């Protein structure tokens, strides 16, 4: 790739690959790598060219400006924000005032003429690509400039000059010093690429891994209307999608979760260049905010491209994509190694021990907890108010904020999604962040003490006061063998990918209640009879079901997503999903639920479980749950999902519920379907062999079994000290159940609280020959290791 014997000043993307990072920087080298190697595999990258590091170095050398730059940097205190700002501004002005050498200007002119030959009105993106950028140990997130909708050769030339100057942005100078890079060893390449008309469609960022947990079996995609800069900066709360890779590879529907973002604003082309700007920000019409910015087919298509890119690079990738509004085609406009998870880590578990008044909530970044006094920062001029340990509260951050972000104990923003700047840097620094809160800067007051918790799932909470929390560290690579399986109880799909990274042998209890309560929130009957509801209730439900075609589809679709997330997280290990076990008072608390539920004196012993499923008043609601399970197993192919029936009072009820399941298309044994029964009523143990005729095994619910064996209300504080699963009467019932299952060669596990709380009880169950213990995630490692010690 020589040019008249000297190093070329400009290279086309299709001449480049990853071995050219030192010539054109990580960003441009990666674009070249994809055009050269992945074009035939369905990965589309817009064409373009790059100026080389030689071109940049010659530009600085020939003008002599480099000497002045390095002298000024050597005598600047980088940690003094004022000094840094003054030096940075001076250096950037020197570069902008320096003319290009004629050879470089001509080389850019020739390449530009070729790239715009088919359309003289073509618009371009001009991006920076630093030669040290996108190395896996340094996330230069957004540290240099990007110019969009640049039209005409003169405008491209100006943009390239500004890109060169951006190597000396305050944040870039500060970052290099703190990461140990020598300023003299870093050069800049400008990439000039044809624009994808995503101003007329949507764009976003995707990762070939779950960014929060490091779980590598999903692609995580974010999307919003307009140009991608809004998502990258965190100026909008985007739509989010998770796609399961093994399901995608099997050519099945693979989207396991969709979350609609508010998408309030978008960046589009400015009709005329306003104030020298080629783009403008405008409000998104309400009807577009209320729908997803990608179709399911487009989400799957993007995920396929992400998988191809990850496979080619052999590592998790962070990818920017754009959809062309004219052609509908999806393009990849950037790909770099995903920085945070590439580092390797010790497993840390943060636990909040109490909860206070919630001041704000948004998207949780990471799984940590931080606490301290609030500092509301309205703009960058107030940066120096941040002291170490403060909770930084602001509208949104950009890379200029990095020097102070590392001082914060937590970060809270009004705007942004999980791929915004604040999120990327918070992960890198290991600081909890709650982004996209909407009005945190108004609700949180300077100086008040708060606790910021990201340890409770996808939603992050800001609580009033300093609350008590703890952190456990463990780095367990391989677990010792036991004569039983250690499984997990999981209710919240938001935490599934995180929990799947713990040592485990599947899920012994996945509860539907959390999904119905938190992801749906509406009584199933109120949805089935939507047209009969009061207008006010209809409006409330419409607001909740945005993104779904009908009330019925909202219930089935959300349940499907929740179950699929749990199934995908632990695939191919077994995931036993217990169908809904709400009591009548809990169903009544759902939106629209009051008119459909009986008022019972003791709901714990009332209308629940199997009896509810087969009753005329609930059968068609139960059918919705069955439909969701069928979609997960039959359409998506997640046949590791099994179902469990709670609170089966009589053998006749057992027979009736299994027949009802078959009527709904869930026939025992078909497509490998296993149906497990909760063994949680004394009658279940006393007549265990008869109950087992209808099921593939038992999962012991020790909470209800204890309550019913000892005649205790487990919700009553008055008798709570008598509640103990280790009571001999309870153990006698459990022994009967275990022996009966063993005799018939059927599965028997336990999913009650007992073995998580009492290691001696877990040890007794192991001696009894139980097949599995399903434990709370925070006790899995400890209980597993303790039982292994006993077996020695």
Swiss-Prot record:
Highest taxon of the lineage: Bacteria
Gene3D superfamilies linked: ATP-grasp fold, A domain (3.30.1490.20), ATP-grasp fold, B domain (3.30.470.20), Phosphoenolpyruvate-binding domains (3.20.20.60), Phosphohistidine domain (3.50.30.10)
Alphabetical GO biological process terms: gluconeogenesis
InterPro entries according to UniProt: ATP_grasp_subdomain_1 (IPR013815), PEP-util_enz_mobile_dom (IPR008279), PEP_synth (IPR006319), PEP_util_AS (IPR018274), PEP_util_C (IPR000121), PEP_util_CS (IPR023151), Phosphohistidine_dom_sf (IPR036637), PPDK_AMP/ATP-bd (IPR002192)
Family (UniProt): Belongs to the PEP-utilizing enzyme family.
Function: Catalyzes the phosphorylation of pyruvate to phosphoenolpyruvate.
Protein's recorded name: Phosphoenolpyruvate synthase
Lineage: Bacteria, Pseudomonadati, Pseudomonadota, Gammaproteobacteria, Enterobacterales
Span of the signal peptide: none
Entry's free-text remark on domains: The N-terminal domain contains the ATP/Pi binding site, the central domain the pyrophosphate/phosphate carrier histidine, and the C-terminal domain the pyruvate binding site.
Keywords for this protein: ATP-binding, Kinase, Magnesium, Metal-binding, Nucleotide-binding, Transferase
Cofactor(s) required for function per UniProt: Mg(2+)
GO molecular function, a single term: pyruvate, water dikinase activity
Note: The reaction takes place in three steps, mediated by a phosphocarrier histidine residue located on the surface of the central domain. The two first partial reactions are catalyzed at an active site located on the N-terminal domain, and the third partial reaction is catalyzed at an active site located on the C-terminal domain. For catalytic turnover, the central domain swivels from the concave surface of the N-terminal domain to that of the C-terminal domain.
Binding sites annotated in the UniProt record for Mg(2+): 680, 704
Nucleotide-binding is among the record's keywords: yes
Chain sites annotated for binding substrate: 511, 578, 680, 701-704
Catalytic activity: pyruvate + ATP + H2O = phosphoenolpyruvate + AMP + phosphate + 2 H(+)
Enzyme Commission code(s) on record: 2.7.9.2
Pfam families, sorted: PEP-utilizers, PEP-utilizers_C, PPDK_N
Regulation: Activated by a Pi-dependent pyrophosphorylation and inactivated by an ADP-dependent phosphorylation on a regulatory threonine. Both reactions are mediated by the bifunctional serine/threonine kinase and phosphorylase PpsR.
Active site: 421, 751
Involved pathway(s): Carbohydrate biosynthesis; gluconeogenesis
Quaternary assembly: Homodimer.
């Amino acid at each position: 790739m020589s040019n008249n014997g000297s190093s070329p000043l400009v290279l086309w993307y299709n001449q480049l690959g990853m071995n050219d990072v030192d010539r054109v920087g990580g960003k441009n080298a990666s674009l070249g790598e994809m055009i050269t190697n992945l074009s035939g595999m369905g990965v589309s990258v817009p064409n373009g060219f790059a100026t080389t590091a030689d071109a940049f170095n010659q530009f600085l050398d020939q003008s002599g400006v480099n000497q002045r730059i390095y002298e000024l940097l050597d005598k600047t205190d980088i940690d003094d924000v004022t000094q840094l700002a003054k030096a940075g501004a001076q250096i950037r002005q020197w570069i902008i005032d320096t003319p290009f050498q004629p050879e470089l200007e001509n080389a850019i002119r020739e390449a530009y003429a070729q790239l715009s030959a088919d359309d003289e009105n073509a618009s371009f993106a001009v991006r920076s690509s630093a030669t040290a950028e996108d190395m896996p140990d340094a996330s230069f997130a957004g540290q240099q400039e990007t110019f969009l909708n640049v039209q005409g050769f003169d405008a491209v030339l100006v943009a390239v000059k500004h890109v060169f100057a951006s190597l000396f942005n305050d944040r870039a100078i500060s970052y290099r010093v703190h990461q140990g890079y020598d300023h003299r060893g870093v050069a800049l390449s400008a990439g000039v690429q044809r624009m994808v008309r995503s101003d007329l469609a949507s764009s976003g960022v995707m990762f070939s891994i779950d960014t929060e947990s490091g779980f590598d079996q999903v692609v995580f995609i974010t999307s919003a209307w307009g140009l991608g800069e809004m998502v990258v900066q965190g100026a909008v709360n985007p739509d989010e999608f998770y796609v399961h890779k093994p399901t995608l590879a099997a050519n099945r529907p693979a989207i396991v979760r969709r979350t609609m973002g508010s998408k309030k604003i978008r960046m589009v082309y400015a009709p005329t260049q306003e104030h020298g700007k080629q783009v403008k920000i405008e409000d998104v019409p309400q009807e577009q905010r209320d729908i997803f910015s990608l179709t399911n087919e487009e989400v799957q298509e993007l995920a396929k491209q992400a998988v191809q890119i990850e496979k080619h690079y052999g590592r998790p990738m962070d990818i920017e994509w754009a959809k062309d509004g004219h052609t509908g085609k999806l393009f990849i406009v950037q790909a770099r190694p995903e920085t945070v998870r590439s580092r390797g880590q010790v497993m840390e578990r943060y636990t909040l021990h109490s909860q206070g008044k919630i001041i704000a909530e948004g998207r949780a970044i990471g799984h940590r907890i931080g606490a301290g006094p609030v500092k509301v920062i309205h703009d960058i001029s107030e940066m120096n108010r941040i002291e170490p340990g403060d909770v930084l509260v602001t509208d949104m951050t950009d890379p200029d904020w990095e020097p102070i972000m590392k001082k914060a104990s937590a970060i809270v923003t009004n705007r942004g999604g999980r791929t915004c700047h604040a999120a990327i840097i918070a992960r890198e620094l290991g600081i909890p962040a709650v982004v996209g809160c909407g009005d945190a800067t108004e609700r949180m007051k300077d100086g008040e003490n708060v606790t910021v918790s990201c340890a409770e799932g996808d939603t992050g909470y800001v609580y009033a006061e300093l609350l008590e929390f703890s952190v456990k560290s463990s780095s367990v690579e391989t677990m010792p063998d036991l004569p039983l399986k250690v499984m997990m109880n999981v209710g919240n799909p938001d935490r599934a990918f995180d929990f799947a990274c713990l040592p485990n042998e599947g899920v012994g209890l996945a509860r539907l209640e959390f999904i119905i309560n938190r992801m749906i929130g509406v009584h199933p009957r109120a949805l089935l009879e939507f047209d009969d509801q009061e207008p006010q209730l209809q409006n409330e439900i419409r607001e909740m079901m945005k993104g779904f075609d009908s009330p019925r589809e909202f219930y089935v679709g959300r349940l499907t997503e929740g179950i699929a997330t749990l199934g995908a997280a632990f695939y191919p290990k077994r995931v036993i999903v217990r169908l809904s076990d709400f009591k009548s008072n809990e169903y009544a608390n759902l939106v629209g639920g009051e008119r459909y539920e009986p008022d019972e004196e003791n709901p714990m012993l009332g209308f629940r479980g199997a009896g509810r499923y087969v009753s005329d008043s609930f059968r068609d609601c139960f059918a919705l749950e069955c439909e969701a399970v069928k979609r997960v197993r039959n359409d998506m192919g997640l046949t590791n999902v099994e179902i469990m029936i709670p609170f089966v009072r009589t053998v006749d009820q057992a027979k009736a519920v299994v027949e009802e399941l078959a009527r709904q298309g869930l026939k025992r044994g078909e497509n490998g379907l296993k149906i497990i029964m909760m063994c949680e009523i004394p009658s279940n143990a006393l007549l265990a062999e008869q109950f087992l005729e209808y099921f593939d095994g038992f999962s012991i619910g020790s909470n209800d079994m204890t309550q019913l064996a000892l005649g205790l209300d487990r919700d009553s504080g008055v008798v709570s000290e008598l509640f103990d699963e280790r009571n001999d009467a309870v153990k006698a019932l459990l022994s009967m159940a275990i022996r009966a299952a063993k005799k018939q060669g059927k599965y028997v596990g336990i999913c009650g609280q007992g073995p998580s709380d009492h290691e001696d009880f877990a040890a007794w169950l192991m001696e009894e020959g139980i097949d599995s213990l399903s434990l709370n995630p925070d006790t899995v490692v400890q209980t597993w290791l303790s039982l292994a010690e006993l077996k020695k």
